[in-house]
């Protein structure tokens, strides 16, 4: 059912491309979704579309959207409310009540890790492999160190991104191309957790990997700040 909604969005996108073409630019490194269209169109709008169009959520329902933003991540998120009416709320027309709750809004990064530690939850392979942030794989806000990690683990994808710069005639960063941006920066990849790297390369992560069976350890990417992703 969710797949049907996503496919409908893709059909609409194809029609829009026929009318006005594609953007032919990377998202802007800005704070608003108008220029940074990736966050709005590829993340928020997808969830909104599913909620508004899926038969089981379209009308006569009460929905709680739970998300993990923290005020300490950025000045923008510091202004977020813990609980509020979600943008897909449509009580009068469709009797659809949608609230949003951010349960960890006032948590520090250490608070979050302590919750995972208490329940022996295995951190995402990204963190265990050295990434300080589990965001889009090649987020426009990624630092040179993070892009160097992409270049190491996903050389074909990195090359495709370089090629996109040439095809579009625009660079990912507004001051230099990808090669200049990354340069000879050392990769963020931590090679001490082979299983994490295997999961990232293969995309395999099973239910058996959810919990840590031995001692819980902070991942290599912990406590390196929130830089490298949109806020």
Features from the language model and the residues they span:
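Nucleotide-activated chemistry modules centered on ATP-dependent adenylation/adenylyltransferase
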Residues: 1-231
